[in-house]
Amino acid sequence: MPGRLMPLARSYAYRGYTRLPHDRVNAWRERASGRASVAAFQRVLGSGPVEIGGGLLKGALLDTRALTLTHVQAFGLVRGALEPSVQEALRRHVAPRATVYDVGANIGFFSLLAARLAGPDGAVESFEPLPAAAAGLRRHVALNDARTVSVHEVAVGAHGGRAQLMAVQEESWSHLAERGRHPDTQGVLDVEIVTIDELVAGGMRPPGVVKIDVEGAEIDVLDGMAETIRAHSPVIICELHGSNAEFLARTSAIGYVAQNLDGPEPIAEAGGIHALALRAG
């Protein structure tokens, strides 16, 4: 199929697979015939990119080397339905020509969305310390000709230096070793850590929006951008991993108001959620 027809066809195939009953699919995959069929299906889908079928990033291309039929986020990515509350928050707060920092960018879904929203005069600084995810991020930047996205293969924290990163089979759950060992940990990587304050002081364009998804290290990221917050008041969109009370305390102390993006439940009483924090007034 010429042009974009084949990526679109692969996208429909992925989405069709997700409509099958989950329990039956799992039982089928356990059988030898099912495993062989899944492997064959994966080879077809992996033969080239797929087109995102909906949402704010509809029409963008995904590299299927970053996806498998068992990838926990694969179907949300292909449907364009990944973390809709975060997508909507970016839509509301990323204006044309904005600068967005994507901290914990993974393979780049939100970096691409931020680039689309900010337009050709915007800038997206994407931070991803895990080599495999950073490679997927670079492929997505190239595949979509996202020239305003810059990829930084580093972690972001409270202090510059180096630290150990627990690499987990499901890449989106990898985290700094000081946060504890995940049961699916496959290895430990030595990574560079930078702070947002250091980057801005060194000449990087200051952010108007900072999106944070760092599997428990979100308070460290905030501590490392205290001066940037004071000087530039960026909008903060953050996934919380048990740090709800501390996030509220930190944002309140710097004159921000935080709200739960995922529902009406107060942040302090919620579990793992996405939060939005804005300068009060």
Residue ranges and their predicted role:
Residues 57-88, 147-148, 152-205:
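Glycine-rich adenosyl-binding loop in Rossmann-like folds that engage adenosine-containing cofactors
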Residues 114, 137, 141, 165, ...:
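Hydrophobic packing residues within well-ordered alpha-helices of enzyme cores
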Residues 198-281:
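Conserved acidic-Pro-Pro-aromatic motif
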Residues 142-144, 166-172, 248-257:
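Short, hinge-like loop/turn segments at secondary-structure boundaries
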Residues 105-107, 131, 156-158, 214-216, ...:
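Short, glycine/acidic-enriched loop or turn micro-motifs at the edges of active sites
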Residues 131-132, 186-191, 237-242:
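Acceptor-substrate binding/catalytic loop of class I
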Residues 1-140, 144, 203, 269-281:
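S-adenosyl-L-methionine
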